């Protein structure tokens, strides 16, 4: 028996543990949870004739011959889980006042909430990685609980993924005389819409701003474009708004995720992404596959947090959040990804 109801867990999860990474916030504002295990693209408003190309991955290799186009898709299922160890409730928590120790019941509540925070963060990192990969490459590999890895390909045009080479590398240009504006305008022509924002990783930004022409043209004053400033303000410590370059906002993203205990950057070194803040990114979710959720009438949901105790000798208590995320772009060609060199 849990001391928290699902509604309480959902409320606590949403209010206290909201993770707000850049790509999800800027480009993936629509959310579509489904009551079915599969996500049906035909049921998303305005998404006419969109299909994904899906291919199984065996031993790290994409098996194209076994892939195919589909308008219905089964997302990977993720469910990070923790045990609430009774021994932990007997020890002082790191931020506890030694002169005013809390009781074990209070510590248990704190541990449960910390577990839920960690589980939410784990899922949010999966979502952001899917979102970043969709924008950067137009595809990503989806994995999940007891789920064979599958590549999800949204059909990005080859010319929208650019690698500087053959003398076009910015690192080889004269920083005092060369103006990279023409390059950016040429790259932007590949986008299916208007480009109003450029996102750099820190190293890509350092290379870009090393040009004298950039320093002269970059407008760092506020008030240049109120709509864009609203879109990119208050994005957290991993994001820095650098100013306007003509009518394009410049943002630097240093967001990280944790893989096998090691921090890694979401954006590869020397990355530049051209896009539009009105691009239609879709957060879709398959149904929650849990008998308790079904009994509570929760099927279509981005999250299902639960806290329960199994009887026995001894009894054991657990926390878990379940989700079946699939981040999609209605038009993957709204973005142009450039690997700077």
Swiss-Prot record:
Disulfide bonds: none annotated. The keyword Transferase does not apply. GO terms for cellular component: host cell cytoplasm; T=7 icosahedral viral capsid; viral capsid. This is Major capsid protein. Gene3D superfamilies: capsid protein of prophage domain (3.30.1930.10), putative capsid protein of prophage domain like (3.15.30.10). It is found in: Virion; Host cytoplasm. Keywords: Capsid protein, Host cytoplasm, Late protein, T=7 icosahedral capsid protein, Virion. Homomultimer. Interacts with FI protein. Its main location: virion. The keyword Zinc-finger does not apply. It comes from Escherichia phage lambda. It comes from the Viruses. Assembles to form an icosahedral capsid with a T=7 symmetry. The icosahedral capsid is about 60 nm in diameter and composed of 415 major capsid proteins. The assembly is primed by the interaction between capsid assembly protease and portal dodecamer, and major capsid proteins assemble cooperatively to form the procapsid with the help of capsid scaffolding protein. Major capsid protein forms hexons and pentons of the icosahedron. Viral genomic DNA is packaged into the procapsid through the portal vertex. The gene is E. InterPro entries: Major_capsid_GpE. It holds the Pfam family Phage_cap_E. Belongs to the lambda phage major capsid protein family.
């Amino acid at each position: 028996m849990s001391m928290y109801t699902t509604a309480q867990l959902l409320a606590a999860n949403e209010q206290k543990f909201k993770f707000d990474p850049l790509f999800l916030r800027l480009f993936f504002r629509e959310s579509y949870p489904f009551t079915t295990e599969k996500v049906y693209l035909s049921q998303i408003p305005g998404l006419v004739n969109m299909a994904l190309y899906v291919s199984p991955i065996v031993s790290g290799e994409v098996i194209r011959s076994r892939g195919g186009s589909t308008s219905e898709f089964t997302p990977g299922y993720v469910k990070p889980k923790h045990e609430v160890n009774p021994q932990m409730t007997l020890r002082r928590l790191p931020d506890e006042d030694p002169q005013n120790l809390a009781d074990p019941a209070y510590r248990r509540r704190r541990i449960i909430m910390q577990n839920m925070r960690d589980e939410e963060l784990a899922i949010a990192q999966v979502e952001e990685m899917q979102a970043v990969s969709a924008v950067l490459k137009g595809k990503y590999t989806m994995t999940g609980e007891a789920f064979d890895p599958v590549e999800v390909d949204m059909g990005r045009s080859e010319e929208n993924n650019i690698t500087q080479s053959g003398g076009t590398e910015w690192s080889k240009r004269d920083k005092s005389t060369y103006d990279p504006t023409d390059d950016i305008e040429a790259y932007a022509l590949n986008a299916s819409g208007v480009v109003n924002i450029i996102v750099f990783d820190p190293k890509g930004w350092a290379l870009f701003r090393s040009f004298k022409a950039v320093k002269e043209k970059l407008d760092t004053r506020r008030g240049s474009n109120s709509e864009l400033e609203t879109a990119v303000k208050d994005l957290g410590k991993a994001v820095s708004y650098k100013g306007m370059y003509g009518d394009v906002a410049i943002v630097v993203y240093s967001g990280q995720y944790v893989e096998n205990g090691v921090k890694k950057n979401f954006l590869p070194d020397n990355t530049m992404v051209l896009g539009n803040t009105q691009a239609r990114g879709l957060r879709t979710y398959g149904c929650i596959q849990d008998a308790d959720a079904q009994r509570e009438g929760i099927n279509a949901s981005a999250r299902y947090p639960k806290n329960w105790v199994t009887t026995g000798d001894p009894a054991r208590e657990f926390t878990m959040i379940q989700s079946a995320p699939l981040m999609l772009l209605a038009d993957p060609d709204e973005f142009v990804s450039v690997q700077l060199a």
